[in-house]
A protein has these predicted regions:
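Active-site bordering "gate/hinge" segments
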Residues: 1-355, 375-431
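Active-site catalytic microenvironments in core metabolic enzymes, especially phosphate/sugar-handling
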Residues: 366
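A translation/RNA-centric and nucleic-acid-associated enzymatic feature enriched
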Residues: 353, 358-360, 370
């Protein structure tokens, strides 16, 4: 039997740096490993001693793609710690904000990073010539998502309108009405992109490994902004109990922590959300899920990309509904007045890559005494490793380059944000 040695350093078409190592001999996998080599980011240390109104601004910089999600998780943690209530209008606007980010991130990942795998090219660049209409459709949807996020959040990345207690400046009702129509008009383009992905979905490997899925879940909505922690294995947990759910631990090959709950690992992200919130998908989103044969509980991690597509359509439709609700009684609300106080708070939102937790402890002056952030990709690393261990033995009869591509595709299916996940370093000095 042939000997296989794969060493992919700095996997491409993902955010950050990760390596794939695989060695096989005599028809047996001797070693397979997902290595995270990114340098730690230390954001929990950055925010210590900082006043409450600065934390969302700082922590949004954890990620340029998920800056809105980090801002919202940060604000929710601060508001929980200080017993700050926000208006129904602000809650609806924040739901719009997270839809904007979902659309931004999902179309970026599907259109630029995953499509080359579906069409057998090394990057999206050759597709500009061979599939011009498809690439232009992706660019059109990406531009709309960016513009929509700017209208709601003040700018496309690192939002300025989202502040503790509400909004710095509420979006213009005329702008909301304008983008309501643009969202409706985008459905045709979204259907075009979905149809192209459906036609090429045969390129996604048919691989399943049973695992636990964790996401926000709610009784009356497809949970992104609010809800309980849901598990396909263990029901629901209060957000405050997130530490006992994620159970972080360290491994030698990773600068990011691993997580586990009821099994050896769990998965977060679009597929986890769909598995737990399927019944609350919008009508067109559910139609596309059915066309792809995607229904709960799906254990194929490659279908995470299909779930992202379904969520993109859901975000369009639900955003239109949210705008309709907002415009029924829209107000130019004043900026909230906040009196700092001591307290602990946890904020959770489900961002494009999965459930995100921020926890802060404040002193009586409103300065941060302690912070903890648990990032979605950090929760997925362990599941990627266990998928590797199950997937690699099924590939041994393939050429080495094809094995390498399949392993790379598996990581890309998770849409990892690797540099976000290497967020914590604890150094204990002994003299």
């Amino acid at each position: 039997m042939k000997e296989i040695n794969i060493n992919v350093e700095h996997l491409t078409r993902v955010e950050g740096h990760g390596n794939i190592v695989m060695n096989a001999k005599n028809g047996k996998v001797e070693k397979v490993m997902w290595e995270v080599s990114e340098a730690p980011r230390l954001f929990e240390a950055f925010v210590r001693g900082k006043p409450y109104h600065q934390l969302a601004r700082i922590t949004s910089r954890i990620c340029g793609i998920c800056s809105i999600g980090h801002t919202l998780a940060s604000l929710k943690a601060t508001e929980a710690a200080m017993d700050i209530e926000i208006s129904e209008q602000s809650q609806l606007l924040r739901r719009l904000a997270i839809h904007g980010e979902n659309m931004q991130s999902h179309i970026l990942h599907l259109g630029y990073l995953i499509s080359p795998d579906l069409f057998g090219t090394g990057s999206v660049v050759p597709l500009v010539r061979t599939h011009t209409d498809a690439v232009l459709a992706v660019v059109k949807l990406h531009r709309l998502a960016n513009e929509f996020s700017e209208v709601v959040c003040g700018r496309t990345t690192h939002p300025t309108n989202l502040i503790p207690g509400g909004f710095y400046k509420t979006p213009s009702p005329l702008k909301l009405q304008e983008y309501r129509q643009k969202l409706l008009d985008s459905v045709e383009t979204a259907n075009l992109v979905a149809g192209i992905i459906l036609d090429n979905a045969g390129a996604l490997p048919d691989f399943t490994r049973e695992t636990e899925f964790i996401a926000l879940t709610a009784k009356d909505e497809y949970a992104l902004y609010d809800g309980l922690i849901g598990s396909t294995d263990a029901g629901t947990y209060p957000v405050d109990e997130y530490v006992s759910v994620v159970n972080e631990f360290v491994v030698p090959q990773s600068t990011a922590k691993y997580c586990k709950n009821k099994r050896e690992a769990f998965m977060v992200g679009a597929l986890a959300r769909l598995n737990l919130n399927y019944d609350h998908l919008s009508p067109l989103a559910k139609q596309w899920a059915e066309k792809f044969g995607l229904k709960p509980v799906c254990h194929n991690p490659f279908m995470n990309n299909v779930a992202q597509l379904v969520e993109f359509v859901h975000s369009i439709e639900d955003s239109v509904s949210l705008i309709d609700r907002l415009l029924e009684d829209y107000k130019d609300e004043p900026r909230p007045e906040i009196t700092p106080k001591a307290g602990r708070g946890v904020g959770a939102v489900d961002v494009p890559r999965g459930i995100l937790f921020h926890e802060y402890v404040y002193d009586s002056d409103g300065n941060c005494a302690r912070a903890n952030c648990v990032i979605p990709t950090n929760q997925n690393h362990n599941n990627i490793q266990h998928d590797f261990e199950a997937f690699a033995p099924t590939l041994l009869d393939k050429p080495e380059k094809e094995i390498e591509l399949n392993m790379e595709m598996l990581v890309r299916a998770y849409d990892p944000c690797i540099s976000c996940s290497t967020h914590f370093l604890n150094v204990e000095w002994k003299r």
